[in-house]
């Protein structure tokens, strides 16, 4: 699963997921899966969607993952009293703003790409849409 190799600080503030997205265009492949809603993806969800797409296209074509989980989420163990410091890092997430391209695909037909992205979208907690590369 995806997670940073090293970080300057182990734990992070909760923060707020506001603002506009970077990476709103399809840059590497022909087709993309774009987030319509706002939320956060865990490393497990990113990997589950990737596996679903890879299995559906039967290892032909190429897939790019355009998001990376770089925010640690902590939690305290069950039945532990409040206080005594922040909990341990449990998992990693990536904060998603509307318009962010999550995955890209190349080397497959549009129909196959649509089906693969539909399977991937079922694994994600966000509303997504299918996009194609805009040629100017």
Curated annotation (Swiss-Prot):
Instruction: Tell me the keywords, alphabetical order.
Output: Ribonucleoprotein, Ribosomal protein, RNA-binding, rRNA-binding, tRNA-binding
Q: Does the keyword RNA-binding apply?
A: yes
Set out the biological process GO terms recorded for this chain's protein: translation
Q: Which GO terms describe its molecular function?
A: rRNA binding; structural constituent of ribosome; tRNA binding
Among its keywords, does the record have Ribosomal protein?
A: yes
Domain of life the protein comes from: Bacteria
TM helices/strands, residue ranges: none
Query: Belongs to which family?
Result: Belongs to the universal ribosomal protein uL16 family.
Q: What does this protein do?
A: Binds 23S rRNA and is also seen to make contacts with the A and possibly P site tRNAs.
What does the annotation say about its assembly with partners? Part of the 50S ribosomal subunit.
Q: What is the protein name for this chain?
A: Large ribosomal subunit protein uL16
Q: Which organism is it from?
A: Shewanella pealeana (strain ATCC 700345 / ANG-SQ1)
Name of encoding gene: rplP
């Amino acid at each position: 699963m995806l997670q940073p190799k090293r970080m300057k600080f182990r734990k992070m503030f909760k923060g707020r997921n506001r603002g506009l997205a970077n990476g709103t265009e399809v840059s590497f492949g022909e087709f993309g899966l774009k987030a319509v809603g706002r939320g956060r993806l865990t490393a497990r969800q990113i990997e589950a969607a990737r596996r679903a797409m890879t299995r559906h296209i039967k290892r032909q074509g190429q897939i790019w993952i355009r998001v990376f989980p770089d925010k640690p989420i902590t939690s305290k163990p069950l039945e532990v009293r409040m206080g005594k410091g922040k909990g341990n890092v449990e998992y990693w997430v990536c904060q998603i703003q509307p318009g962010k391209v999550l995955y890209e695909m190349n080397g497959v037909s549009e129909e196959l790409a649509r089906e693969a992205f539909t399977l991937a979208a079922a694994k994600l907690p966000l509303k997504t849409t299918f996009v194609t590369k805009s040629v100017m």
